[in-house]
């Protein structure tokens, strides 16, 4: 690159900074180097013998965060890294130098998942939050959200084989290419949504149920700061209540736990009490009877607090455009863990800006 071109590039990057490059804010707020110890040693080259030297693992991890923020496919991510100067600067790649292709990005994410390093990085970032003073406090809120995947077109016999727990290779032994494209971990469920509406006589109108195929993201956030502290992934058909123990933490400064009525059961109430946690779970309406006024008022009060977790899912779906393109629950969990990390990083930027602004 000649001197004139280099000067023009420097001038262009300075203009990006002047107008407020959000990636510079992310770089200044999150200590990405802190994750290096969990990332070093992963196979993050292109996988070919005698091929190009491996890319820096921290740069590769930052690329996955960008991918989660924009919900890009691996192929599109390869293009965007080459296309955007601000992204290249954030990832520490040189203009005209080598950048990771889609296979390298996929292989790095798979190794990050298979080695368990991704979960350790999530915990390491939580430690980073605590070090900055964002400890879990004021109780925790639990909820789950459906995340769709591309629908599968299977015969009745194939559907039954999936329900029986058979692997894709067992169902399509003579069609390896087809088996590789089949997700046998995702499940169908009915998503009932919308505001409850009533007839003139006061009886509720039927709710709209929309069939959804995919996975379910279970999370808990701390009430004070709104960071995702615990998370789990299941198929879409898994019952919310059964995941309470997976996502409730005993490390919050308050023992209060908020959740909707799907989490209310004698078993869960007994377990919370055994952990010295106070249940703030919604009460269910008695079958065939009106909801007692006291219970209705208590539920309304709980809803005002519990609604905060809906902002997390809205952020991931509206800003990130969260949708899973990968196959299998292991890769789905990786995608959702990265989305949770990306959300927590955005949340940290929000709190840090508010602290500076007073």
Model regions and ranges:
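Charged, often Cys/His-bearing segments associated with DNA-binding zinc-finger transcription factors
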Residues: 1-40, 351-358
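Basic, short loop/linker segments at the boundary and entry of helix-turn-helix/winged-helix-like folds
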Residues: 16, 23-65, 69-70, 104
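Acidic, metal-coordinating catalytic cores used for nucleic-acid/nucleotide bond scission
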Residues: 51-55, 258-267, 285-287
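Polybasic low-complexity intrinsically disordered regions
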Residues: 75, 79-82, 92-96, 100-274
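Hydrophobic, well-ordered secondary-structure elements that form the walls
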Residues: 101, 260, 279, 310-312, ...
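Short, charged, surface-exposed secondary-structure boundary motifs
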Residues: 242, 267, 288-295
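Basic, amphipathic alpha-helical segments enriched in Lys/Arg and hydrophobic/aromatic residues
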Residues: 270, 297-358
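Short hydrophobic/aromatic-enriched beta-strand-loop microsegments
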Residues: 275-283
């Amino acid at each position: 690159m000649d001197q004139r071109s280099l000067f023009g590039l420097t001038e262009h990057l300075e203009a990006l900074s002047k107008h407020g490059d959000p990636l510079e804010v992310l770089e200044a707020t999150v200590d990405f180097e802190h994750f290096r110890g969990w990332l070093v040693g992963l196979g993050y080259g292109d996988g070919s013998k005698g091929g190009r030297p491996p890319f820096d693992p921290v740069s590769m991890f930052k690329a996955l965060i960008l991918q989660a923020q924009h919900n890009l496919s691996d192929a599109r991510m390869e293009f965007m890294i080459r296309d955007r100067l601000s992204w290249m600067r954030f990832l520490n790649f040189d203009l005209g130098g080598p950048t990771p292709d889609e296979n390298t990005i996929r292989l790095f994410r798979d190794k990050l998942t298979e080695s368990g390093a991704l979960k350790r990085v999530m915990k390491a970032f939580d430690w980073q939050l605590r070090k900055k003073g964002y400890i879990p406090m004021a109780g925790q809120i639990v909820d789950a959200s459906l995340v769709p995947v591309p629908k599968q077109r299977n015969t009745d016999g194939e559907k039954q084989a999936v329900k029986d727990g058979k692997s894709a290779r067992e169902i399509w032994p003579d069609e390896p290419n087809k088996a590789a494209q089949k997700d046998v971990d995702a499940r169908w469920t009915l998503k009932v949504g919308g505001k409850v509406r009533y007839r003139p006589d006061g009886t509720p109108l039927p709710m709209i149920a929309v069939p959804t195929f995919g996975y379910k993201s279970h999370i808990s956030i701390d009430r004070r700061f709104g960071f995702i502290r615990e998370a789990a992934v299941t198929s879409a058909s898994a019952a919310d209540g059964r995941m309470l123990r997976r996502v409730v933490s005993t490390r919050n400064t308050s023992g209060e736990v908020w959740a909707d009525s799907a989490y209310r059961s004698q078993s869960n109430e007994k377990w919370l009490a055994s952990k010295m946690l106070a249940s703030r779970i919604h009460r269910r309406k008695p079958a065939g009877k009106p909801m007692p006024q006291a219970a209705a008022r208590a539920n309304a009060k709980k809803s005002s607090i519990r609604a905060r977790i809906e902002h997390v899912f809205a952020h991931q779906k509206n800003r990130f455009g969260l949708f899973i393109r990968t196959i299998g629950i292991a890769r789905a969990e990786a995608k959702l863990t990265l989305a949770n990390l990306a959300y927590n990083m955005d949340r940290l930027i929000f709190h840090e800006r508010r602290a500076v602004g007073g």
